[in-house]
């Protein structure tokens, strides 16, 4: 079967936003207007629409399902324009900082993005975080200023904030008409027409009329700015415009705006209200006009599996004739199908029944069921092509971030790095009979989310959940209850401390055991040195002349590794150090791998104490947004939490305070902040780095864990 949709008609894009900007409403409206069974012009009464939404939720295919495929034809004047139908793959990205890891992996598979802003709040902290991530992946994007019906909505202030906060050049291509409860529609600056939504059909139909006299001057001014940005993309257009005042025609203008968006020269901006059903169709038109198809994206460069240097010299692009390659970017549990692996196909064709290679893990996988997720149903498919985003059921060894490829032409496309958890809680089922169910549920949640880990405490036997923040773990406990029907009790959150060393030492340890018959003997001499923060651990053997035979060196490494998981101070993992084995002694009869393992372990334990072992704690980057009158109290409170305030700046009519604060002092901060600011201040925090714990606190922690 040949490809049904040419690649130039594909748009793989994500919707990204701060937590309350109205992203979900936006996504739902997009699905509603593009819904296959509810095309524009045949939307039934509200009840049917809501039924469709409910059924969508019942089936678990709301827009939250990683990727949704839907279709859109450019529309003008309430009618379909004479452009072909485009295929939209919408990838959802969460809005909360505890889930920046989710955003990171979505951005790895997007071609473009729509950033949704709240017209009142503008560019918020999480918007900036996501924007920076999108910059890193060089994702072309446009902005939809949502909630123009809200009190205090200010479109032009949002345009200014985009430029101030992100450094991008914002170019409005559609300006809202009215604001708050007088929002009527928008002016399309490209065609210079008003789009007005009237009537009670949930925004499905609208009219285009000439711009009213009272708005002409403003429209001309902003159109001029838009054209200036557009003609910079083409020397001839620039010359015609500057010398003769000749404005480009509509088609040329759109292609110049597209060129500027794709080259990240500027960001097109539109406004509207998804909730009031105004402005969503022009947004969809703009996605088609300005965001990239898979053909507009540069080649994806990968490396050969097993190449330790990771030299990226293997190219893959959206071409059906190339060898198959794809990236698994999200795992979801579906009540009807089991585990679904959402995969972006970068090159080639994938058929049902194919055997493929998971090149990240070096494991073979067989393709069983393949599905296309539509807004209101899932479609079983036999084959998929470059540019598609599909769900694969029944993959055994594949997790988030793995590359899938043709075994004959292997490539690793992406190495996603997942941060270590910074917070942990003990969890147990309320009824003993649920223990098995809880273990299975946690294992499935951990398979979906690489930043979440589950471990068993060897001493207490407790199950420990580890994650990126309190909210992250709260939501996972809630999912245990909702999806796996397990009620759980959770302990107080604990900080994930680490241990390291202060300076280099040389240490020798001799292990001797004689108790009749053959004994045990091993001697090791090691140099233990600190490394730069974040460098991790490395081992090298500098043995010459066979003072420790080769076959015993794995025993030495094993002994060192056993100490890494449980440091000498309080039993926390040890990070950022290196060990060199420089000398040793052995006995022809009494030496063994086990004897050298014990010698290395004891040498490490004694050597680390000599090397000034110290405790490290996670430091969080905290941003508080507060009305000015509460600033003094909030700064004082952060300082009392051992925080270091690094700056403050005006943010709209509020103040933004930046600080670095130890995680240990941030538990339950939300409640303190609410009471200090009468509920008006808000904060976000994310992991920054590890720092040494002050001596007096370190002693308390050691006593607690001794």
Swiss-Prot record:
Signal peptide: none annotated. GO terms for molecular function: GTP binding; GTPase activity; translation elongation factor activity. GTP binds at residues 17-24, 92-96, 146-149. Coiled coil: none annotated. GO terms for biological process: ribosome disassembly. Its main location: cytoplasm. CDD domains: EF-G (cd01886), EFG_III (cd16262), EFG_mtEFG1_IV (cd01434), EFG_mtEFG_C (cd03713), EFG_mtEFG_II (cd04088). It is found in: Cytoplasm. Residues 8-295 form the tr-type G domain. It comes from the Bacteria. Belongs to the TRAFAC class translation factor GTPase superfamily. Classic translation factor GTPase family. EF-G/EF-2 subfamily. This is Elongation factor G. It comes from Ruegeria sp. (strain TM1040). The gene is fusA.
């Amino acid at each position: 079967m040949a490809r049904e949709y040419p690649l130039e008609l594909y748009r793989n894009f994500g919707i990204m936003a701060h937590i309350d900007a109205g992203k979900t409403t936006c996504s739902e409206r997009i699905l509603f207007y593009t819904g296959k069974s509810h095309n524009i012009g045949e939307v039934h009464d509200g009840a049917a629409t809501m039924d469709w939404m409910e059924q969508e939720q019942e089936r678990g295919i709301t827009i939250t399902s990683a990727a949704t495929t839907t279709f859109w034809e450019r529309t003008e004047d309430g009618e379909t324009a004479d452009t072909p139908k485009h295929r939209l793959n919408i990838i959802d990205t969460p809005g909360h900082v505890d889930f920046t890891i989710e955003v990171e992996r979505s951005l790895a598979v997007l071609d473009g993005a729509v950033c949704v802003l709240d017209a009142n709040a503008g560019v918020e902290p999480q918007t900036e975080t996501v924007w920076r991530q999108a910059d890193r992946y060089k994702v072309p994007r446009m902005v939809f200023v949502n909630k123009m019906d809200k009190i205090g909505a200010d479109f032009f202030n949002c345009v200014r904030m985009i430029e101030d906060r992100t450094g991008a050049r914002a170019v409005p291509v559609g300006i809202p008409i009215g604001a708050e409860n007088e929002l009527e529609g928008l002016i399309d600056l490209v065609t210079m027409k008003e789009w007005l939504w009237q009537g009670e059909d949930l925004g499905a139909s609208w009219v285009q009329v000439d711009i009213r006299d009272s708005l002409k001057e403003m429209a001309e001014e902003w159109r001029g700015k838009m054209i200036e940005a557009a003609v910079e993309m083409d020397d001839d257009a620039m010359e015609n415009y500057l010398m003769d005042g000749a404005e480009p025609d509509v088609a040329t203008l759109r292609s110049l705006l597209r060129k500027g968006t794709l080259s990240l020269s500027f960001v097109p901006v539109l406004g509207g209200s998804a909730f009031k059903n105004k402005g969503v169709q022009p947004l969809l038109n703009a996605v088609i006009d300005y965001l990239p198809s898979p053909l507009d994206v540069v080649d994806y460069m990968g490396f050969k599996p097993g190449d330790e240097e990771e030299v990226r010299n293997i190219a893959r692009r959206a071409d059906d004739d190339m060898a198959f390659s794809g990236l698994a970017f999200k795992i979801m549990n579906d009540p009807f199908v089991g585990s679904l692996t959402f995969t972006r196909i970068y090159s080639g064709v994938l058929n049902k029944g194919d055997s493929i290679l998971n090149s990240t893990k070096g494991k073979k996988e067989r393709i069983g069921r393949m599905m296309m997720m539509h807004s209101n149903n899932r479609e079983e498919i036999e084959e998929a092509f470059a540019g598609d985003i599909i769900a694969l059921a029944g993959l055994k060894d594949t997790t988030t971030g793995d590359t899938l490829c043709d075994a004959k032409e292997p490539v690793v496309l992406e190495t996603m790095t997942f941060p270590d958890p910074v917070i942990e809680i003990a969890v147990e089922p309320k009824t003993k009979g649920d223990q098995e169910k809880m273990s299975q549920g946690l294992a499935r949640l951990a398979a979906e989310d690489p930043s979440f880990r589950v471990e068993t405490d060897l001493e207490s036997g407790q199950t420990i959940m580890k994650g990126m923040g309190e909210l992250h773990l709260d939501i996972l406990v809630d999912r245990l209850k909702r999806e796996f029907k397990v009620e759980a009790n959770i302990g107080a959150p604990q900080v994930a401390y680490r241990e390291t060393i202060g300076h280099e030492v040389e240490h020798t340890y001799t292990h001797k055991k004689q108790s009749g018959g053959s004994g045990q003997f091993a001697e090791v001499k090691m140099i233990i040195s600190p490394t730069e923060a974040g460098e991790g651990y490395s081992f090298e053997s500098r043995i010459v002349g066979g003072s420790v035979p080769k076959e015993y060196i794995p025993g030495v490494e094993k002994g060192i590794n056993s100490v890494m998981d449980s440091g000498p101070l309080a039993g926390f993992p040890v990070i950022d150090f290196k060990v060199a084995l420089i000398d040793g002694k052995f006995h022809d009869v009494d030496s063994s791998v086990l004897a050298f393992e014990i010698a290395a372990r004891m040498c490490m334990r004694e050597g680390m104490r000599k090397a000034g072992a110290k405790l490290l704690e996670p430091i969080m980057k905290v941003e508080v947004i507060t009305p000015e009158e509460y600033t003094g109290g909030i700064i004082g409170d952060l300082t009392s939490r051992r925080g270091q305030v690094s700056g403050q700046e005006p943010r709209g009519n509020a103040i933004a305070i930046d600080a670095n604060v130890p995680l240990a002092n941030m538990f339950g901060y939300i409640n303190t902040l609410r009471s200090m600011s009468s509920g008006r201040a808000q904060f976000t925090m994310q992991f920054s780095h590890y720092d040494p714990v002050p001596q007096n606190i370190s002693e308390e922690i050691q006593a607690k864990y001794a």
